């Protein structure tokens, strides 16, 4: 373990929307340091969203998708006397955001559309409408927390 907690590095807001969440999303989308490719994919996905849903702005759909996928609870393993319990714990806001971003990117990668921009656009639309794989992941996490509510007193 570390002697002290690693400092949280500030990210620069993205050039188009001026949002740090967008920058974090693009960084999570990026592979092999190819940031410009990740930016193209992300901005094309938002354009596709705006083409599909004329009256909605792509960035609003993106923000709504992130909010809908953010988990408030998760389960952590805790060993007590030889038994391992799944203990429900609250999720800190920074972790809520990073989990939501990770789940949306993973769900988009596992979809079957042709281009990554299409996959991402459809996953963001699904998440904004409370469906899709990323939203299901959040619901499954809640079910696990609910099923293990009896062990909540083992919180640390």
UniProtKB/Swiss-Prot annotation:
Pfam assignment, any one: Ribosomal_S7
Keyword Ribosomal protein tagged: yes
Domain of life from the UniProt record: Bacteria
PROSITE patterns per UniProt: RIBOSOMAL_S7
Function per UniProt: One of the primary rRNA binding proteins, it binds directly to 16S rRNA where it nucleates assembly of the head domain of the 30S subunit. Is located at the subunit interface close to the decoding center, probably blocks exit of the E-site tRNA.
Recorded family membership: Belongs to the universal ribosomal protein uS7 family.
The protein's name in its UniProt record: Small ribosomal subunit protein uS7
Source species: Nitratiruptor sp. (strain SB155-2)
């Amino acid at each position: 373990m570390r002697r002290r907690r690693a400092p949280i590095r500030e990210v620069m807001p993205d050039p188009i929307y001026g949002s740090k969440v967008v920058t974090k999303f693009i960084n999570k989308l990026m592979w092999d340091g190819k940031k410009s490719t990740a930016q193209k994919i992300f901005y094309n996905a938002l354009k596709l969203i705006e083409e599909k849903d004329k009256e909605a702005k792509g960035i609003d759909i993106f923000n709504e998708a992130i909010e809908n996928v953010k988990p408030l609870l998760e389960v952590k393993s805790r060993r007590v006397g030889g038994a391992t319990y799944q203990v429900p714990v609250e999720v800190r806001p920074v972790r809520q955001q990073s989990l939501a971003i990770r789940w949306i990117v993973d769900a988009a990668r596992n979809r079957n559309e042709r281009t990554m921009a299409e996959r991402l656009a459809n996953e963001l639309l699904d998440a904004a409408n409370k469906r899709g794989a990323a939203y299901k992941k959040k619901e499954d996490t809640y079910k696990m927390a609910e099923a293990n509510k009896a062990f909540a007193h083992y919180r640390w």
